[in-house]
């Protein structure tokens, strides 16, 4: 067994969870599960106790995102991964266009490409660590990209590209929703999972959908296209408007999510959450730029994520050793995305994470580097 150095106490964060999903959960969210353990958990999801939680989540998210008139919060099971498949059945009419700039933004493009009932999608790519600009695609009735690419820490703004009239804008906000600025009216489907900024468990997808998106879903559902019921977006819409899900949800996840949304809204709403992630990301990137051995992986500062920070280290430093030393001291999940294969750390900076803890994390890395503990 390798002996790792013990970090000085001043460099130990108040909470050592820096993972990019699942992410840090606040104690109050766990207490919400305890409080609902007899009255909500273990009861029917078709009855008021659970339906009221779903309704509270939908109302809270509507407030958080300042939903325009006619938009609805829709939810169903399976996470964003299930939503990609559902979108190929029930959102894309004929053809989609995609921005692909990392592991997760590429997966929706792949799902569309594999769907034999759709035309070949157009895909614009960028090297990992960079991101293409939003753009229209000729003949595409859905334009899709990620607000935040979780694998690389690159973010792309949410806007309606010039010339995109008639196309639905579908934004994968899995790791960005709740921590990045957004004007929802610039998207038609802004979908996400709760295990990132919302500090809950996975297995659920939620989406802010525009009237145009709801109309498209209804139109496709009324066609002769085969749609599996579990992936039927119209089924998700119909159940969501009743504050239900098609099949049984993980009720503890709903309780955690509801508590987090209430916390967000009572602490400044989306602007307050973006202020928190901005403070954390500024602390991380400023440190990396000042440190000779380190540098932000995303070269363009405007594209650097506020919620997922990726930091490269030069060849003289073994970033994997840094992560191991941090883990041995209770600072968890700073390893890079597994498929990226880079000499780097990846740091979650979601709203529940305090910027003071990010500052302590950088101090811990300074201690490791200055002590020569991670030299190759």
From Swiss-Prot:
Homodimer. Pathway: Amino-acid biosynthesis; L-serine biosynthesis; L-serine from 3-phospho-D-glycerate: step 2/3; Cofactor biosynthesis; pyridoxine 5'-phosphate biosynthesis; pyridoxine 5'-phosphate from D-erythrose 4-phosphate: step 3/5. The gene is serC. PANTHER family: ALANINE--GLYOXYLATE AMINOTRANSFERASE, AMINOTRANSFERASE CLASS V. The modification N6-(pyridoxal phosphate)lysine is found at residue 196. Keywords: Amino-acid biosynthesis, Aminotransferase, Cytoplasm, Pyridoxal phosphate, Pyridoxine biosynthesis, Serine biosynthesis, Transferase. It comes from Corynebacterium glutamicum (strain R). This is Phosphoserine aminotransferase. One of its GO terms (biological process) is pyridoxine biosynthetic process.
């Amino acid at each position: 067994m390798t002996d790792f150095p013990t970090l000085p106490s001043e460099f130990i964060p108040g909470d050592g969870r820096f993972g990019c999903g699942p992410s840090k959960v606040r104690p109050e969210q766990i207490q919400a599960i305890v409080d609902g353990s007899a009255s909500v958990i273990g009861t029917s999801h078709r009855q008021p106790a659970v339906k009221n939680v779903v309704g509270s989540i939908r109302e809270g998210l509507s407030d958080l995102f300042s939903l325009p008139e006619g938009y609805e919060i829709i939810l169903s099971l399976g996470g964003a991964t299930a939503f990609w498949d559902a979108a190929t059945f029930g959102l894309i009419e004929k053809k989609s266009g995609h921005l692909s700039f990392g592991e997760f933004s590429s997966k929706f493009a792949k799902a569309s490409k594999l769907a034999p009932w759709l035309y070949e999608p157009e895909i614009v790519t960028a090297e990992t660590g960079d991101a293409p600009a939003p753009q229209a695609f000729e003949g595409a009735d859905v334009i899709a990209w990620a607000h935040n690419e979780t694998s690389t820490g690159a973010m792309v703004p949410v806007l309606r590209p010039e010339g995109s009239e008639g196309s639905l804008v579908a934004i994968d906000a899995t790791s960005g929703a709740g921590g990045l600025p957004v004007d929802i009216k610039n998207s038609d489907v802004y979908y996400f999972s709760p295990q990132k900024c919302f500090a809950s468990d996975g297995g659920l997808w939620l989406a802010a959908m525009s009237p145009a998106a709801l109309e498209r879903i209804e139109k496709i559902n009324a066609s002769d296209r085969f749609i599996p019921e579990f992936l039927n977006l119209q089924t998700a819409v119909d159940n969501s408007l009743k504050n239900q899900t098609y099949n049984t949800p993980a009720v503890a996840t709903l309780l955690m999510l509801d508590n987090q949304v209430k916390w967000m809204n009572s602490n400044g709403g989306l602007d307050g959450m973006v202020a928190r992630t901005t403070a954390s990301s500024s602390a991380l990137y400023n440190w990396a730029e000042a440190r000779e051995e380190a540098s932000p992986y995303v070269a363009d500062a405007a594209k650097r994520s506020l919620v997922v920070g990726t930091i490269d280290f030069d060849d003289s430093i073994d970033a994997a050793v840094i992560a191991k030393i941090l883990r041995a001291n209770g600072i968890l999940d700073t390893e890079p995305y597994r498929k990226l294969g880079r000499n780097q750390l990846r740091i979650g900076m979601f709203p529940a994470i305090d910027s003071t803890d990010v500052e302590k994390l950088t101090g811990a890395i300074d201690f490791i580097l200055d002590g020569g503990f991670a030299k190759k």
